[in-house]
């Protein structure tokens, strides 16, 4: 009704952009007349105009028109009007919701080029290394064509490589690499160790995945800590003796466990009448984690075991998270459960949440196919407005109502039946599962049915073929099982992805990869053999495949960017022949798949978040293609079991519905959506609470990191140490004069101890001085003592005092910050109990965290001054 009266609010937000798009379109004919070199000269012209105070808004239509023309010449892809709208939304620091297949990667070119002209560096963030490399090599060619430099950050890169790539105009990286580099930079002991520039503008691809799904997991750099391995083993043994619903209760919504009185007594008896809550030797955290490991964290669902290690599986993407560990002893508890080596518990050296990390960017924007359901959170926490970009073609996908079965058996049997029917029909099917275990269960069923299929989950043997499997999931009769959204970022094209097949064939012709996926085609097809002969006459293949630039050149060969490189020109000619071959080969197949109804997506369980369900559905019906989706559910599914599953079961029993027959009802769909909204609200509250608490630490983090950076950037830190000493001395004197039972002798003794002096001050003389005169007198002595200490140390080696100052400052800041993080963690874990005393835990946390921080800063000052004045370097012979 409101939409009828006032119009669609999203449409109102989009309308102003349409006027700018008209201006961009008007400039298209003019730019088409420019030669390549004239088009490339536009960049230098824009930079000069911007440096002469021309505004981005004035130049924006021409800048976007230039990028569109460059994209057409380099990639053969021209931005549609809706893609221009997406680019305008991003430039305004908002989130552009664009459906799957609408060309988000191409859209990001527009704002990244415009903002890179300022010279401060732009970051394009993706969810994995593969997508970062793909985008930098593909659309990065447009930036290079226009004269900008393109960088890429990948796992395993050296410090030098990282610094060089961050200096580029546009840098592609994953969210985790960016975050960890930021933390490492703020642990650096030399300016040369810092790799990042100050942040400027950032575009996040799959922004909902990074800012919502990963917001609960902070980035942590850890060091070795003390962990009693025997406690994890003993707690695991005890947990096996405890009985669910008698000794402990499970809160599945909160993913938490609660020990009953009976359970506490049982644990204490098993431990020899030990109080499990004893603060000096606590057992409770170990037992709680052991029960969580037993009940809430399951192999092939939440983790896999690889090389005797527990590897986390991302519950949202189905990908393995190498190098990541659960904190607070949970990972060790799972290691004890699975009888694999228990790694030492670590101590946090530096940490930050993605929420606070991305808020460091003065200008932030993002793209995704699914953000509307989370727009409240994105606005409240990040200040990011969500705008929905219209699709280029009308969406044709049909989303069928869910089918709900009484048992898991009935559900999986029906899914397998549907896969068989679709396969026999020739229609491609994509089945999304929620875990490794369930993907393998369905795979076993399909094998029994004789249905050929591809399996993609977190297991290493499947991950290696990820892009290939997803790219070919639209082939005639293809059946693909994928865990959640593994493979996200690679489009499923009806009839098959010809460009992917052509590139794979080119790689096979060069023998770049040992394992060929289409080697039979190549071996038996005369045209392919002719192409191989052609390559051999033009290239030294062995030299080429050993060239470090091999992959980059292959990427360039598969694009349309200008090049003088003879090797790339040769490979591009072969690639074009392969493209034409596969397009001709697959064109009838594409038409056939379209006529059958396109890709059919099957969901095997409703996720806790509607977004994840929408992402799965969004694989079908891209760019106006036909498609459909359907979810098959069971009353045993987690979401239904936790929320209202028993009520639906009663209805099915009352109606005497057979186990093999499903319920299909819009009312039930609404009930499920309501359950999902409850879960989403719960997790939003958890993320908001995390943000509120981490914001307190964030202010402290920024203060410490600012101080550290200034220390690294300052050549002479003498004034720094003296300022620390003055502040400490002034505090001692203030304390002396403010106390009723003042003790001047004790005050002077503290100052003498701080400065490494023995019986230096005359108490009788000092007692005759007023507050200000006493300060001036002691600070005067401080400067004399410091000059003497500097002369003494510089006798050993000229300039040694400066090195000691920096070393002591960084050493004490880092060690104190590490201890502070530990204290903050303990405070955070215990503060919740204040709520039972009618106190607001957050306010209590803020007050106590502030006091801890003030004490830490005071301790740093005192310790640094003490170390400098007590240092006694030894003269070398």
From Swiss-Prot:
Catalytic activity annotation: ATP + H2O + cellular proteinSide 1 = ADP + phosphate + cellular proteinSide 2
UniProt: ATP binding residues: 83, 101-105, 491
Membrane topology note: Peripheral membrane protein
Chief location bin: plastid
Gene Ontology molecular-function annotations: ATP binding; protein-exporting ATPase activity
Signal peptide: none
Keyword terms, alphabetized: ATP-binding, Chloroplast, Membrane, Nucleotide-binding, Plastid, Protein transport, Thylakoid, Translocase, Translocation, Transport
Name assigned to this protein: Protein translocase subunit SecA
Species this chain originates from: Guillardia theta
Role, per record: Has a central role in coupling the hydrolysis of ATP to the transfer of proteins across the thylakoid membrane.
Stored Pfam families: P-loop_SecA, SecA_DEAD, SecA_PP_bind, SecA_SW
Entry GO terms, CC: chloroplast stroma; chloroplast thylakoid membrane; cytosol; plasma membrane
Gene that encodes the chain: secA
